[in-house]
Amino acid sequence: MVESSRCGGTALRNLLGDKGTILVVDDEASIRRILQTRLEMIGYSVVTASDGEEALSAFRLLTPDLIVLDVMMPKLDGYGVCQELRKQSDVPIIMLTALGDVADRITGLELGADDYMAKPFSPKELESRIRSLLRRRNDRTTTAAISNLGVMVVDNLKIDTNKRQVYKAGERIPLTGVEYSLLELLMSYPGKSFTRGEILQQVWGYNPEQHADTRVVDVHISRLRLKLEDDPENPEYILTARGSGYFFQRVAQLEH
């Protein structure tokens, strides 16, 4: 059953200001209750769902600004929900997983999630990551030098910086908001190597004190290569700087 309640009443929400709607999906009622209470106390509207099917119904009905999504759930697990959502939306997704294996944790990222946290997790850290992702989503402008320059071209790739859209050989390539921001950052400074930590700060908005897993960056780079490179195993655009990070090795041209 999809649930929505307002902790603290209308007066408190008006005082804090509505920061957006978050969909919390978890089959554990205690986790749903804790997250809903904490997030509403700091100004978010929160809707909860207890399984994957409810989550998809809630998304279609409410179009939330961000989703906190558990992996292990009845009916349809978090992986399945993430796959379905990515067919129609680039809404930020933070996955929660109790699975101990690193490969299991990374699977959600490979399916299009923006970030993940392992259970048990710190609610305060989750709140911080939510703020970071929503801030990046709401503020589409970046410090990147190419922002709003129009259409940029590299071989058969076209990047419309105004519409935040990418095309390959004339076909639009669907990118999540994080994937686009990552590509834009690297393309802004061709040849410049960015460490994983710098990318987490620039793209995810995390500060150095946040102990985010840098493998999040690696998985998103892999997803970009799969979508943009003719041969992802031997990339021509996004290269690895050994022992450092990643860089974009080609200089884009403005389309006139």
In which residue ranges do the predicted regions lie?
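Receiver (REC) domain active-site loop signature in two-component systems and cognate sites
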Residues: M73
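Basic, amphipathic DNA-recognition helix from helix-turn-helix-like DNA-binding domains
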Residues: D27, Q83, K87, P92-V153
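Acidic catalytic/metal-coordinating carboxylates
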Residues: D51-E54, D77-G80
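Short hydrophobic/Thr-rich beta-strand motif most characteristic of the beta2 strand and flanking loop
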Residues: G43-S50, A58
